[in-house]
Amino acid sequence: MRSNYCGALRNEHINSKVQLCGWVDRCRDHGGVIFIDLRDSSGTMQITVDPDQGTDLFNIAESLKNETVIQVTGKVRSRPEESINKKLETGQIEVLADVLKVLNPVYGNLPFAVSVHDDEPLKEEIRLKHRYLDLRRERMKKNLHLRHATIQTARNFLEEEGFIEVETPILTRSTPEGARDYLVPSRVCEGEWFALPQSPQIFKQLLMVGGIERYYQVARCFRDEDLRSDRQPEFTQLDMEMSFMSQEEILCLNERLIACIWKKIKGKDIKVPFPRLSWQESMDRYGTDRPDTRYGMELVDVSSIVKDIGFKVFSGAIQAGGSVKCIKVEEGNQSISNVRIKPGGDVFNEAQKAGAKGLAFIRVRVNNEIDTIGAIKDNLNNQQKNELLLKTKAKPGDLILFAAGDTEIVHKTLDKVRQFLAKELRLISTGKSKDQWNFLWVIDFPMFNFNKDEKRHEAMHHPFCAPNAKDIGGDPGLWEENLPKARAQAYDLVLNGLELGGGSLRIHNPELQQKVLETIGIAKDEATEQFGFLLNALEMGAPPHGGLAFGLDRIVMLLSEEDSIRDTIAFPKTQQARCLMAQAPNEVSKRQLKELHIASTWVDNE
């Protein structure tokens, strides 16, 4: 149907006869000559329709609506000097049409303009409802091409490193760890259910037992969890697993992979190796295991300095086993007023969202004099004040913000305030930090969290992470005692405060795997029921192995400089996990439910 793509024509095609297909981006009538911007997936070409070419041709051109699908036959020629568009790669040429055929008209009115010349912002709801139209827009086309290029770059890199791509099952069994599963009833096996995979975790480990050694997959994953801007109920991972590699070898290989992607897609040289921070250091310095290191305001523990100053908020927190920590805001005296820190202010509100009751503060004035609330100023002696200023490295003009209480809440509070102020003070939107890619590995995570409500241990990542051998010792008799305090051989890759992915070395000893499952409350009988096939495999010569997975949607979001992963996915769901275009999820017929031996108990109370 066509001889060339619109965006591929150049000066060397002048005087060539071509046949093009695409959508009418816009039509313009200039003094009796009609100009059509014809758009296809490659770009735009100007079509000129001259009345001298025939009345029928001209009448068709006059009747065209935007987004009509047409076929054009004509000759490529140079544009007149005054018509050259240097902004377009095809801007020096045009096609003089001698045949114009409408392949499919537009019926009715379009819900929004698609033209490359129309950049009017649209509500996301209408974009998602008519996604097939939204995909024609330059923004989405660019994002999907970038996504494709990212995947191809990763594939090429991994295949050069000896990896092979293997698909793992989509219909699998439900297991007790992780988020809620999406369940699929089996018609053939009455009363039984499949689960959609939250990750290919167990299957990729079984591939290592099977001797594959280096596996990767662009894997579809499914999690029934609460959503936000960078989460979807179905998402894509760049998933990997490797045998006979140490943690450091895995980190180094993936640093090179990330550097390769950023060089190919963004043209940026990323310095490797990436910094490594232990989980504990990350929490101590930033209050989070996903730190943004493009700016300062690191946390400082001042508990030992302020414990005896007579301020009950501080002393009470420390006596209860908590802590007092602070961040220093350089030149904060000018940029942050007291009103913003006190109840009702925006800085106060950010702290409150994290669970804090409020923030204390000190303003450093000339000659290191301080302004603060009376309860602190009246009880802080010169030695304590000097120690505080020395430890925080505060100078005149700086503002010190304090959080006190349970250390976990203190960390969440100062992390949230730190991120909020970085945006408010434009620390990450101007200058060097605007185009700064601060990658780092967070390592040495705790193996377990302790769930205070349920009074039991939970795996911080998942129950297949290998513990640090130094932490558990070589004697299996000590595993039960040492495991809860052990560090995992786990690692997360963080970029500018966002987790790009993570992984770990895996347990390849069946006894240790059983003990880890017992530690999180999965008894031996239940472990055999839920994970028996994995435990059996580990008994049959499982190699040392490890891996990781990157969130592909999130990587593409960052590379494309979008704010939401929904703008990097062809057909995403909303934050209510709905597809507005296909109207999914939807009710199904009673006949379908009967075939699956399912009865609905849901009652519409509206």
From Swiss-Prot:
Disulfide bonds: none annotated. L-aspartate binds at residues 177, 223, 461, 506. It is found in: Cytoplasm. Keywords: Aminoacyl-tRNA synthetase, ATP-binding, Cytoplasm, Ligase, Nucleotide-binding, Protein biosynthesis. One of its GO terms (biological process) is aspartyl-tRNA aminoacylation. ATP binds at residues 223-225, 232, 499, 551-554. The keyword Nucleotide-binding applies. Gene3D superfamilies: Bira Bifunctional Protein, Domain 2, GAD-like domain, Nucleic acid-binding proteins. It comes from the Bacteria. The record marks 30 as: Important for tRNA non-discrimination. It catalyses: tRNA(Asx) + L-aspartate + ATP = L-aspartyl-tRNA(Asx) + AMP + diphosphate. Pfam families: GAD, tRNA-synt_2, tRNA_anti-codon. Belongs to the class-II aminoacyl-tRNA synthetase family. Type 1 subfamily. Homodimer. This is Aspartate--tRNA(Asp/Asn) ligase. It comes from Prochlorococcus marinus (strain MIT 9211). The gene is aspS.
